[in-house]
Amino acid sequence: MISRFLTLAFFFLLYFAEAQNEFITIWQPGITTNPVQTVDAPFQANANQIWFPGIGQNYTIEWEEVGYPSNNGTMINVTSTSQVLIDFGPTREEGQGATTKYRVKVSNGNGTFQQFKSVSYQIIGTVPANMQSKGSLDKLLEIEQWGNINWTSMDAAFANCQRVLLTATDSPDLTNVTDASLMFYLATSFSGAPSMQNWDTSNIEIFKHMFDCRHASQVYISGETFNSPIGTWNMSAATDLSYMFAGRQHFNQNLNFWNVSNVTNMAWMFAACPVFNQPLNNWNTSSLENIEFMFFLNHVFNQPLNNWDTSQVIKMNNAFSFATSFNQPLDSWDVSSVTTISAMFSNASSFNQSLGSWDLSSLVNGLGPLHFSAINCQNYSATLAGWADNPNTPDNIDFGNNTPAQYAANVVNKRDFLINTKNWTISGDTQGSCILSTVEIKNNQKILIYPNPTSDFIYLNQISDAKKYQIIDFSGRLVKHGELKEKWIDVKSLTNGNYILIIKTKEKELNFKFIKD
């Protein structure tokens, strides 16, 4: 008796363990969709069939009718590079064929099941296009269990699965996954689950379009509810977060403790996220290169970002366009690598900050960054003055139409300098009634040395009380020193290389690195 009990217990535990190993999904093959979804397959599945978009070698598929588990089937040694047809046959649920659901369980079997990929697609520009369904995506209702499948990729795993829900309480094995692009792209019913906070994302590099709910036509979809707690994810390997939450109407989770130190691309990340307003000031953005359209059409975001390291950023166009609540100082941003700020604050109807401290030395496209922003006369004047007085400001910039900005009478000469000397094109602004004080103008001028690199002279800007200088080479040796009687220092006698210039004023010492060439 005891022996029989132990034997039964052993087989029960074995069955339970095997059941936990399966990737389980729920399907409704008889459901109708308008318009009819076409699968890129040899033929279209009927009301008792599905195309299962699985990829693997010699894996096993088991299925059963929900509510009638005796109606089941098994497919062994399945090998597929795109999809496999599952034929459920006639339902046991009399008269209910259209609503009959099936539980599909996939295990490694005699080989390996590797990937579930719903669509093939191309990226045209930065947007997914030419999507072709590889499975009966409109018939997939639920992810019930992840099992122990060692996934190799989550690229487009559930893209365009517009009915899919996540009810699994376990976590997928993402150890070997580096790409989660489009994982739930256009999965409009996907609301996530609390279990997502336990996912190990430490090796994933690409998160672009992961939860994006926006058609290639840039139309955003209403009615979705995704707002899962994913603030604990390990993002240390991440490089691309572009479009990650674009168009998600309810997403508002705290992501401030994400490690984004390797991320280069955040373009469109929170675009058209109408409730997202969480702090991001802890982020290490030292690798960041692209923030174009990052907060585009986000009407509530208004969090401090002034401590971001933007020294590597190249693209800032439309970053806060139509971000109608945003009004935070960005005067400490290093924009010296930025090539485009076009429409950056266009229609940002609360933005009223001076940008006069910005170093625009790499700027190529500056078209209309303040068009219909809320910048007032003082801050717009300080911006023009700061840029006019900065020797790094480039020539030949089309600043475009910045209606309805106004400038002070005493910065007309600064604006004229940009137009007549720097060959800028500026339109849409008009002279206002404010007066910019001398202190305000000076506060928008950086302490600078220029040119750098240099071959003969270093010129000093805005160091009025400088008394003495020292030049030290990179071995620590003092190579030149003297009294500062002019606004320049002759360095022609120095050999080519890297140096540190120390300027001594009444109150402090200022250190600058420069290159003699």
Question: How should each PLM-predicted stretch be described?
Answer:
Residues 7-9, 18-19, 392, 419, ...:
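A generic structural signal for short, non-catalytic loop/turn and secondary-structure boundary residues
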Residues 1-5, 15, 20, 55-56, ...:
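Generic structural signal for short, solvent-exposed loop/turn connectors between secondary structure elements
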Residues 1-23, 240, 438, 452, ...:
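Bacterial Sec-dependent N-terminal signal peptides
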Residues 8-10, 15-16, 282, 290, ...:
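Generic detector of low-complexity/intrinsically disordered segments
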Residues 20-435:
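Negatively charged
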